[in-house]
Curated annotation (Swiss-Prot):
Keywords: Cytoplasm, Ribonucleoprotein, Ribosomal protein
Protein name: Small ribosomal subunit protein uS19w
GO biological process annotation, one example: translation
Compartments in which it is found: Cytoplasm
Similarity annotation: Belongs to the universal ribosomal protein uS19 family.
SUPFAM superfamilies the UniProt entry points to: Ribosomal protein S19
Superkingdom of the organism of origin: Eukaryota
GO CC annotations, alphabetized: cytosolic small ribosomal subunit
Amino acid sequence: MEPEVVAAGIVKKRTFKKFSFRGVDLDALLDMSIEDLVKHFSSRIRRRFSRGLTRKPMALIKKLRKAKMEAPAGEKPASVRTHLRNMIIVPEMIGSIIGVYNGKTFNQVEIKPEMIGHYLAEFSISYKPVKHGRPGVGATNSSRFIPLK
């Protein structure tokens, strides 16, 4: 900061980047109908919505609404568990906490605005990443000569 500003005692307010999804701000996204919202999604997700929402995703959204209504003001809503890894995140879900099943456990995922248009599965990894060990017996000649620890 400039010394004149510090000497005057004026503190400049920090400005944060306002979230927007494909040029539309968050408040407008929350007010949009699903038909208008789908126009901003990628083609894969537009196709998914055009084929219709079945009963299961709608049941999850109803449970999320109920959890938000029952939560006290200023508190996070209760977690809602689901196996629906193929559910697409819509603006209505923002702020909710969802337990996404990965085949073994439910991973807690707090929905943030940046997640709109992604699948729930992208935030709950279903496999354990490989930690490679030492080269084995059948390894090639060049990889056998890695110095031992």
